[in-house]
UniProtKB/Swiss-Prot annotation:
This is NADH-quinone oxidoreductase subunit C/D. NDH-1 shuttles electrons from NADH, via FMN and iron-sulfur (Fe-S) centers, to quinones in the respiratory chain. The immediate electron acceptor for the enzyme in this species is believed to be ubiquinone. Couples the redox reaction to proton translocation (for every two electrons transferred, four hydrogen ions are translocated across the cytoplasmic membrane), and thus conserves the redox energy in a proton gradient. It comes from Acidiphilium cryptum (strain JF-5). GO terms for cellular component: NADH dehydrogenase complex; plasma membrane. It is an enzyme of class 7 (translocase). It is found in: Cell inner membrane. It catalyses: a quinone + NADH + 5 H(+)(in) = a quinol + NAD(+) + 4 H(+)(out). Its main location: membrane.
Length: 592
């Protein structure tokens, strides 16, 4: 039985949420948990999950409109669980309210012999994929789910990889031998069965065609398969199939130190560079209690915005190519090369510098950095004006994108859309403005919005974000504060080398942090940022060790791709190519 509300000290936000639940649902049992991220965290019994989440979405005074994330934790080997309900596996629902600019985390304890709860796919449609992922990775079932199939691993996979008793290294497996019989079985498992997805093979007038688009197709932007149900060339329905790029990024975190996992984050949104490091190191710093110096914060912002520009240029060029223009993609990749020259001069690497550190950045800015950036700022602004004439005013580009792939603001919130895709529907919500981090509150920039939510508007928002990133970088250039580029906190990694020969304590700390990695105190924290493709967050569970007990990577592209059937029904295959291009995703960000 869980603890009653009045016996637990609660924040004002928790008081309001729980009091609202009690008024509506009557007496309920729950536990309140304090976390390092200060997000109200409420444990409830599995029998009332559906009712509680339904109320938080539809009946609360200020609704939590978005299911931001849904994941699980295998608690069986966790040591530090004082004051928490007994649980073998824990479901974690993370909701966001844009009205109150607040979050709530709902946790559900499950016993190993009773791993099933009611599905919430009827409340939030984006829960469909999240629940499939939890089933695939942990073996937790969801009663009433329409298609509870594996999603990141092949249909023939055995076991649930994010369980603690599942092996973490390929060297722990036996040799892999692909016999002809096994190859045929694997291929047969990939055969699409329309009935399993609730699809009909025939209409009243004709037979439907089922077309595989991908996984090897240049217009699906990665190893990604969409099964299209067609009547003629019109799309009746679609089934996106992901997982071909899954590499076990979350599992890898359980065997890397807090420091050595940083390069792995670069490979999630592989066009975002250090933008991937940002939420991870901030989550570690939140757990460790590290305060980052102002110079390091400003350097982080500047590098993140440079990578935002680089990523958006790839989007702009490939989107124009997808709808029939060839020249722009070459021009924009040339511009991205200029950005990479600056990044390489500062970080030493181009696409994946892994340059952020726990407590700061890897090194101070090199001599002449300001001149390189100042030259680039003047160059890129003029190029954007030329691209506007070349692409955005082109009547064929407009014909292929205006009114195509549109969704409403309500649909965007239901499906978990964030970033440019959300702002294209008219909601000017940007993490850098609404919940500023790393010093963004000291900078002036606008939040571009549109109102039609179609392919064209999504491109417009991306372009205007490039202009705002240039504006932010100029302010970083003109107002870079003096001071250290790394915190002197004892858990900063690597620690300051200068102090190692002065006293024994810092020498010991340096040795331990470099050889074993820092030991973080037990706790939990979710830190999110406004990344290139939407809101990206890292949910870390520390158990007093040198490695993460659980690392959850919440990426924007995962829910975005799930919308494809909704916005492609009734369109043509050619329209689908424009729709896919306008979403702005990479498959590593989806599959992790």
């Amino acid at each position: 039985m869980l603890t009653e509300f009045n016996s637990i000290p609660a924040t004002e936000a928790e008081q309001g949420i729980v009091s609202d639940l009690v008024r509506t649902l009557g007496p309920i049992s729950f536990t309140l948990q304090q976390t390092a991220d200060r997000i109200p965290t409420i444990w409830i019994d599995r029998d009332i999950v559906h009712a509680v989440l339904r109320h938080l979405r539809d009946g609360a005074t200020r609704r939590f409109q978005m299911l931001y994330d849904l994941t699980a934790i295998d608690e069986r080997q966790r040591v530090h669980r004082d004051g928490l309900p007994k649980s073998d596996f824990t479901l974690v629902y993370h909701l966001v309210s844009f009205e109150r600019n607040d979050d709530v985390r709902v946790k559900v304890p499950l016993a190993e012999g009773a791993l099933e709860v009611q599905s919430i796919a009827d409340i939030w449609p984006n829960a469909n994929w999240y629940e499939r992922e939890v089933w695939d990775m942990f073996g937790i079932g969801f009663a009433g789910h329409p298609t509870l199939f594996r999603i990141l691993t092949p249909p023939t996979w055995t076991g649930h990889p994010l369980r603690k008793d599942y092996i973490a290294r390929a060297t722990e497996m036996g040799p892999y031998i692909l016999t002809e019989e096994k190859e045929r079985a694997e291929q047969e498992a990939l055969r699409f069965n329309p009935e399993a997805w609730g699809m009909k093979r025939h209409s009243e007038n004709s037979d439907f065609m089922f077309l595989n688009l991908g996984p090897n197709h240049p217009s699906v932007h990665g190893v990604f398969r969409i099964i299209l149900q067609l009547e003629g060339e019109e799309i009746v329905d679609a089934v996106p199939e992901i997982g071909f790029h899954h590499r076990g990024a979350e599992k890898m975190a359980e065997r890397q130190s807090w420091h050595t996992y940083i390069p792995y984050t670069d490979r999630i949104d592989y066009l975002g560079g250090v933008m991937n490091n940002f939420p991870y190191v901030m989550a570690v710093e939140r757990l460790a209690g590290i305060e980052v110096p102002s110079r390091a914060q400003m350097i982080r912002i500047m590098l993140a915005e440079l990578f935002r520009i680089a990523s958006h240029l790839v989007f702009y060029g490939t989107m124009s190519q997808d709808v029939g223009q060839l020249s722009p993609v070459f021009y924009m990749f040339s511009d991205r090369e200029r950005v990479f020259q600056i990044i390489e001069a500062i970080c030493g690497f181009r696409m994946h510098p892994a340059w952020f550190r726990i407590g700061g950045v890897a090194a101070d800015l090199p001599q002449g950095w300001d001149r390189m950036i100042r030259d680039y700022l003047g160059y890129q602004s003029k190029r954007l004006d030329e691209y506007d004439k070349l692409v955005m005013r082109n009547r064929l580009f407009k014909a292929r994108t205006i009114g195509v792939g549109a969704y409403t603001l309500e649909e965007a919130l239901d499906w978990g859309v964030t970033g440019p895709g959300l702002r294209a529907c008219g909601l000017g919500w940007d993490y850098r403005r609404q919940r500023p981090y790393s010093g963004y509150d000291q900078l002036e920039f606008d939040i571009p919005i549109c109102h039609n939510g179609d392919c064209y508007d999504r491109v417009v928002v991306h372009i205007e974000e490039i202009r705002q990133s240039l504006r932010i970088i100029r302010q970083c250039l003109d107002n870079m504060p003096p001071g250290p580029y790394k915190s002197d906190h004892r858990l900063t990694t690597p620690p300051l080398k200068e102090r190692t020969m002065q006293d024994i304590e810092t020498l010991i700390t340096h040795f331990l942090n470099v050889s074993w990695g820092p030991v973080l105190p037990p706790g939990e924290a979710m830190v999110s940022i406004e990344a290139t493709k939407g809101i990206n967050g890292y949910y870390l569970v520390a158990d007093g060790d040198t490695v993460s007990y659980r690392t959850r990577i919440r990426t924007p592209s995962f829910p975005h791709l799930q919308m494809i059937p909704l916005i492609s029904r009734g369109a043509y295959v050619a329209d689908l190519i424009a729709i896919i291009g306008s979403i702005d995703f990479v498959m590593a960000d989806v599959d992790r």
